Design a protein with these regions (language model features):
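A common structural junction motif
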Residues: 226-227, 342-352
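Conserved catalytic core of nucleic-acid polymerases
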Residues: 28-29, 178-318, 358-368
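Conserved "right-hand" nucleotidyltransferase catalytic core of DNA-directed polymerases
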Residues: 1-119, 128, 132-134, 141-144, ...
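Helix N-cap motif at beta-to-alpha junctions
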Residues: 213, 332-337
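Cytochrome P450 catalytic domain signature, combining two hallmark sequence patches
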Residues: 29-33, 153-170
Length: 368
């Protein structure tokens, strides 16, 4: 209404040509697509634009998406005040992940916004605990970094001792420790850590760091010299995947690397062995082995969370929802919460201590 009042245009917030009319009226510049020269408005462009009316368009889009994607979906799937989503154990025709993490559909409860400080809590506040309980959020602290350290210890890799010592002393932060070891800012250490864990290439990692190629190369060199165990582990797991075509997660689940590609650098479609042999000849290698560490760590994190859910179920404790490394459960009192934490922390045994952070409130939206 404010936009129409000031410009006389009844804007369709998802139609680029309609938004372009507003920009033209306000004498504002905007991008166009290369092929058709059609108006182009990205989310970041609209959100970061200095003009207040443009910010209102971005805000209206955000609210509309939250309503249609989440609120309407929640109402649609509500049954007697509860929602029973479909949970996908592994990758299949109807959803799921290749790493073994749970995914949800109809509705996708894991996508309910958390980072949006305004809309996220409002939508999450629709989720309430059982009567006379509080909503408890139990979150594995640094689940993936702990698993990296666990495997580095098992392989006796150089440089991991300092991290192990910190974890045994108490509330250690992996990214802080690595930043100190590598003598780089924490933000850069965290970006490199997560990039390596997730199998990110050097170019993408450089873009995430937001620095020049030369600066990125210096950072990588310094990181790998001072924190050698991460790259060593990544290389070891990649070699195992390349030689045997498989790796196993913490609790023994098999991750296969059954597709092949030519040895030479370039963009090639990964193919089954016989097809790749016919297409490219004998100079082929297994594809996607650069993702081996990611599959090992995420797959093992999934193992840990699922094992915790099984152990909780044995005690009659049923989570309402699982979101990555977090379980949300109706909690009776402090003693009940401590019991849940203890079960989760001891569901599997690692070479470093496990830690579960706990927060509670009257509903999901009041937490963080």
């Amino acid at each position: 209404q404010q936009i129409k009042k000031e410009t006389g245009i009844d804007t369709q917030i998802w139609a680029a040509r309609s938004i372009a009319q507003v920009f033209d009226k306000l004498n504002l510049d905007y991008d166009r697509t290369e092929k058709t020269s059609a108006p182009s408005f990205t989310k970041n462009f609209l959100q970061n634009h200095p003009h207040p009316l443009v910010k209102q368009i971005a805000r209206a889009r955000e609210i509309n998406k939250a309503h249609t994607t989440f609120i309407d979906t929640i109402i649609k799937h509500s049954h007697k005040g509860r929602i029973h989503a479909e949970i996908n154990q592994l990758r299949g025709d109807n959803g799921g992940t290749v790493t073994g993490r749970f995914s949800y559909s109809n509705p996708n409860l894991q996508q309910i916004p958390a980072r949006n400080k305004d809309l996220g809590p409002r939508i999450r506040s629709l989720f309430i605990p059982e009567e006379d309980h509080t909503w408890g959020c139990f979150d594995y602290s640094q689940q993936e970094p702990r698993l990296v350290v666990h495997y580095a210890i098992l392989q006796n890799l150089y440089g991991v001792d300092e991290v192990v010592e910190a974890y045994h002393e108490g509330d250690a932060d992996f990214h802080d420790i690595v930043a100190d070891m590598a003598e780089i800012p924490r933000s850069q250490a965290k970006t490199i850590n997560l990039g390596l864990f997730y199998g990110m290439g050097k170019n993408k990692l450089q873009a995430e760091l937001g620095v020049s190629k030369e600066k990125a190369d210096d950072l990588f060199r310094q990181y790998h010299n001072k924190v050698p165990f991460v790259k060593q582990l990544m290389d070891n797991v990649m070699r195992r995947a390349q030689s045997s075509g498989k790796i196993r997660t913490l609790l023994g689940r098999l991750c296969r690397f059954h597709l092949w590609e030519p040895n030479q650098f370039g963009i090639h479609k990964a193919l089954p062995h016989d097809q790749a042999l016919t297409e490219h000849g004998p100079g082929i290698k297994r594809a996607y082995t650069y993702k081996a560490l990611n599959k090992l760590i995420q797959g093992s994190a999934a193992d840990m969370t699922k094992k915790a859910m099984i152990e909780l179920h044995k005690e009659g404790i049923i989570p309402h929802i699982q979101v990555h490394d977090e379980l949300d459960i109706s909690v009776m009192d402090h003693t009940h919460a401590e019991h849940i934490k203890e079960i989760m922390e001891h569901a599997v045994s690692l070479e470093v201590p496990n830690k579960v952070d706990y927060e509670s409130g009257p509903n999901w939206g009041t937490i963080r």
